[in-house]
Amino acid sequence: MNLTDFNDFIKSTFGNLLEQFKENDEYGYNNPRSQDIIVVGFTTNLTPDVILKAVDHKVQFIITHHDAWDFLYEVKEQCVKELIENEISHFYIHLPLDCAEFGTCNSLLQEIGISKITQQTHYEDNHEIIGIGEYNEPIAFEELVDRISTALGEDVKAWKNSNTTIKKVGVVTGAGNSTDLIRQAKEAECDVYITGEKSLYSVQYAKFAGINLIVGSHTFTEIFGVNSLVKRLKAAFNEIETIYLEEEHME
């Protein structure tokens, strides 16, 4: 696989989602290199620690959900410097992956055993719309907390604001702490809302609205979407080796 092959794969995989969101903002490259790519590493975030792990595994190409954040001062500059020094290319894909049929929200829902997805995460007029899934049979809130904790490999925070069992689940992976999103879940009659970040306001509003709330980490609520993308890449280019560059549970 080379960079042209990869570009063609991304275009065919994401289609018009690439037109909906801005290149070099919501998806793009750091240090793109013309070379045959054999070893591909993947994870959620681009950080100096991730690049160091990639170097240790002789990775040539890193795929992440997030680019290095500009507001983490000097981090992106350091990442680009290390990518260049170690001759590693990097590709990130953010909102198109969030909204893809196989993307972050749907992949998390599938990971916790959801029976059917009834609403796809998407954007309308620049506003995010939550994903919704349903179980065929309701489960206890405590069982869902255990499922999410096991899937993410970390303790999660949970607020039981209703005694209802869980059948209908609303989710936005990553930074889904907006009260607007929680209100969507409430108005859709979801029994629980799952996300990857919280604030005082999200916790207070969920309690006021009487909707159960489960919060994992931003990083690990979103890794399943990246993994789904890389599995598709491996199916298209069987000669590549894929390596999970697992990050620290620090949130």
What are the roles of these predicted feature ranges?
Residues M1-E251:
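Active-site catalytic microenvironments in core metabolic enzymes, especially phosphate/sugar-handling
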